[in-house]
């Protein structure tokens, strides 16, 4: 039976190199032979197919595709014959002369054996052995065939199809590490043809990121070198694959494994912003990915100059190039952040009242110094900038401390002047109430507690009865102009005074209203009594007239 199979098989193989009609007939007959094979004859067919040494270039891909059909038809029964099939595939790749059709046929055969040669009920050790039998010859071909580029490219393509298979998860960590090691050496040694190698790197970084992290820097350097080769050779497809490989590594691997290469990737991607459209879009996406990873590792990274920023950020800005305001002060010497939100109310309390400008306040006293520091202090309230001269970067905290002391002294002097002007126009009782108000005055807002508000109201009621000179309203009802230097806490007292006057008018009208209400109630009660009496009278005297007459029998 094996002899008859061998003769028919060789005859059909010979017909593959003939005219197209004979070729189609031969392939149909060969596939029929594969499907009709008995399980006991599979090893004979595999041995005869593997022993074919002289296969034409055109028929090589079709011959290897029979292994794919054999795996689909017989499943796990092909697993014991993988050690015989793989040398035939390696030999076919060596003689393919770079034919993409033959390489794709070999990759499909490897993927089919990995998929159908392992059953879900297969023990884990047997699954690992099957993957090892498929992977080991291909991994060795990446290194041993550096002088044979066709074999290396075909092996890389077959390995990619194997890695993308679902059963690749059964591969041991040692096997994955050997593949990564061979791939790193092959990428370093290859000069021009490396597209299949870069595709294999992307597949491994997707399925085995933890193992690839040990070789991440080598892959990045190889990718950048291949990117430069793509520029020299004018190969846009090679540039695109190299950029995609770098992007895959940054997306799937731990950023710490390639942290030292991120800035280099960013700088290289900037060179391809004017390349062809699809290359430019891939470079832009990769550059944004690199920038995001760099910013996560170094928040002070400057994307414009691609270096860490040396200037202070926040309300203290460099005069050479003012950065965007980020709400914090950063000191380079002690590398500590100082939040400037706490300094707003103290440093710019005079600005909040609207009566003091920053340039005219005693806060700016640095003009007499001769040294120039190179930073300005920006007002967060009105946007003015205060030039600070003669202050070193390391003494920025002391500057804030002196500014806070000066602002507190300035506030005390302003409050004392307003209190003195108020005391000259008020009597003793008004001065006491003004002191209570000034005690709770801050930034021009009155903050009187409820009890003090009641005391002020009672005092104003007494003032309205005893002295008319203390009221700011004239008898004609018009208001007198007040001095502009009076404190803002007088405004609530004027409202209280007007309320007190309204209350006195209401108290004068209360007796009249009470008497009128009493008379109205008395009239209504008398009227109701009269109506009730009239109704009872009419009911008593008209009842007899309303009764019908009684009939008396005669």
UniProtKB/Swiss-Prot annotation:
Question: What topology does the record note for this protein and the membrane?
Answer: Single-pass membrane protein
Q: Give me the stretches of Basic residues compositional bias.
A: 419-431
**UniProt domain KASH: residue ranges:** 509-554
Task: Mark out the compositionally biased spans (Basic and acidic residues).
Answer: 322-332
Which positions, given as ranges, span the membrane? 522-542
Q: What happens when the gene is disrupted?
A: No visible phenotype. More susceptible to the oomycete pathogen H.arabidopsidis (Hpa) infection.
Q: Where is this motif: Required for nuclear localization?
A: 551-554
Task: List where Low complexity composition bias occurs.
Answer: 311-321, 465-485
Where is this protein primarily located?
A: nucleus
Q: Cite the GO molecular-function annotations of the record.
A: microtubule binding
Q: Subcellular localization, per the record?
A: Nucleus membrane
Q: Name one GO biological process term.
A: antifungal innate immune response
Q: Fetch the Pfam families from UniProt.
A: TOR1L1_N
Q: Where is this region: ARMADILLO-type fold?
A: 17-290
Record's keyword terms, sorted: Immunity, Innate immunity, Membrane, Nucleus, Transmembrane, Transmembrane helix
Residues folding into a coiled coil are none
Subunit info here reads: Interacts with SUN1 and SUN2.
Q: What is known of its domains?
A: The KASH domain, which contains a transmembrane domain, mediates the nuclear envelope targeting and is involved in the binding to the SUN proteins.
Q: What is this protein called?
A: Protein SINE2
Name the species this protein comes from. Answer: Arabidopsis thaliana
The lineage, from the top, is: Eukaryota, Viridiplantae, Streptophyta, Embryophyta, Tracheophyta
């Amino acid at each position: 039976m094996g002899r008859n199979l061998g003769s028919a098989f060789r005859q059909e193989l010979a017909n593959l190199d003939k005219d197209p009609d004979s070729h189609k007939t031969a392939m149909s007959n060969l596939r029929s032979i594969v499907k009709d094979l008995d399980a006991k004859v599979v090893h004979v067919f595999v041995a005869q197919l593997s022993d074919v040494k002289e296969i034409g270039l055109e028929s090589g891909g079709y011959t290897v595709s029979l292994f794919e059909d054999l795996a689909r038809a017989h499943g796990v029964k092909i697993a014991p014959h993988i050690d015989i099939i793989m040398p035939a595939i390696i030999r076919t790749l060596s003689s393919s002369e770079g034919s993409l059709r033959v390489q794709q046929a070999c990759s499909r055969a490897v993927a089919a054996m990995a998929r159908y040669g392992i059953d879900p009920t297969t023990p884990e050790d047997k699954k690992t052995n099957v993957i090892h039998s498929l992977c080991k010859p291909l991994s060795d071909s990446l290194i041993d065939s550096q002088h044979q580029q066709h074999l290396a490219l075909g092996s890389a393509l077959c390995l990619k199809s194997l890695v993308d298979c679902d059963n690749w998860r059964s591969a041991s960590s040692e096997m994955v590490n050997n593949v990564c090691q061979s791939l790193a050496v092959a990428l370093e040694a290859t000069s021009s043809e490396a597209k299949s190698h870069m595709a294999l790197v992307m597949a491994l970084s997707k399925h085995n990121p933890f193992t690839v992290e040990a070789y991440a820097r080598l892959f990045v350097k190889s990718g950048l070198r291949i990117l430069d080769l793509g520029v020299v050779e004018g190969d846009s497809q090679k540039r695109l694959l190299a950029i995609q490989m770098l992007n895959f590594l940054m997306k799937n691997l731990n950023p710490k494994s390639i942290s030292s290469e991120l800035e280099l990737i960013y700088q290289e991607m900037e060179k391809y912003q004017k390349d062809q459209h699809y290359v430019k879009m891939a470079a832009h996406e990769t550059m944004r990915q690199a920038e995001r990873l760099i910013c996560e590792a170094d928040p002070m990274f400057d994307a414009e100059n691609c270096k860490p920023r040396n200037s202070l950020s926040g309300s203290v800005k460099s005069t050479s190039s003012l950065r965007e305001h980020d709400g914090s002060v950063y000191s380079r010497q002690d590398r500590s952040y100082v939040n400037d939100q706490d300094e707003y109310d103290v440093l710019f309390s005079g600005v909040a009242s609207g009566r003091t400008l920053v340039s005219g306040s005693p806060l700016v006293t640095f003009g007499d110094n001769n040294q120039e520091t190179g930073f300005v202090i920006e007002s967060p309230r009105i946007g003015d900038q205060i030039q600070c001269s003669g202050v070193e970067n390391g003494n920025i905290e002391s500057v804030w401390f002196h500014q806070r002391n000066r602002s507190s002294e300035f506030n005390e002097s302003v409050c004392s002047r307003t209190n003195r002007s108020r005391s000259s126009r008020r009597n003793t009782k008004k001065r006491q109430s003004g002191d209570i108000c000034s005690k709770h005055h801050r930034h021009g807002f009155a903050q009187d507690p409820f009890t003090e508000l009641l005391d002020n109201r009672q005092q104003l009621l007494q003032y309205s009865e005893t002295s008319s000179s203390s009221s700011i309203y004239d008898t004609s009802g018009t208001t007198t102009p007040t001095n502009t230097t009076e404190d803002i806490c007088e405004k609530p007292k004027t409202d209280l005074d007007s309320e007190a006057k309204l209350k006195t008018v209401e108290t004068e009208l209360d007796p009249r209203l009470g008497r009128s209400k009493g008379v109205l109630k008395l009239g209504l009660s008398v009227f109701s009594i009269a109506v009730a009496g009239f109704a009872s009278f009419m009911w008593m005297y008209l009842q007899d007239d309303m009764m019908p007459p009684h009939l008396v029998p005669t």
